[in-house]
Structures are given as C-alpha cells and as structure tokens.
A protein has these predicted regions:
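Classic N-terminal secretory signal peptides
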Residues: 1-20
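Short linear sequence motifs
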Residues: 2, 59, 90-91
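Amphipathic, charged alpha-helical segments and their helix-to-coil junctions
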Residues: 22-53, 73, 77-108
C-alpha cells in the first residue's frame, strides 16, 4: 500500500509538469480544469482545443500509470483510479475544482 501511495504521488507530480503551452497547474488554478471523481482530469468550463489536448495528454499518462499499478498489485484499474481520485482531491489546493461523488463540480 505504501508503494501504491508513493507511486500515486509520483504520478501526480509527473502529470503536473508542462504538457503544452498551458500547463495543468495553470488550467487548474484558472478553474478551467478540475480533478474528476474518476481519478482523471476534466474540463470544468468551456475549454479551448489546447486545453482539451492537455486534458487528453494528462489522462493518457494517468491511464498508463494506473494500468501499471493495477498490474503490479493484481487489482482492477478502476480501483487504482478511485484511490487516486481520493488522494488527488485531498491534496487539491484551496480554490481549485473537484468533482463530488454525484458529479457536481465544487471549489475547494
């Protein structure tokens, strides 16, 4: 479990690095992108094609990492994604958006 948590933390740092002209952190700070309850990021409000590409890139990286974690731990990828969603929401800075269990966007 400690290895899983360490890996999830590393993943969060990795996907926060710039993926295009707009970074994930910038998009989250501006309220354009938020942490979805699925363990992936999603567009909170109208996004540009650049933001849509950023979201797709980040989610592809997360999906790949979640799959590797799931395989190592012999669990389903949905379990990894759900646990990641909990961790990401807990670490989210004040003012950024997350999706609650009912799918509503909330500002922390």
């Amino acid at each position: 479990m400690k290895k899983l948590i360490a890996t999830l933390f590393s993943l969060c740092v990795m996907v926060s690095l710039p993926a295009s002209a707009v970074t994930l952190k910038e998009a989250q700070t501006q309220g354009i992108v938020g942490e979805a309850n699925s363990g992936y990021v999603a567009v909170v409000q109208q996004g540009t094609p650049e933001v849509e590409r950023l979201v797709a890139e980040v989610n592809a990286k997360r999906q790949k990492e979640y799959a590797a974690i799931a395989k190592r731990n012999n669990i389903d990828i949905s379990q990894v994604a759900a646990r990641a969603a909990e961790k990401l929401e807990a670490r989210l800075p004040k003012g950024e958006y997350y999706q609650d269990n009912l799918g509503r966007w909330k500002q922390k």
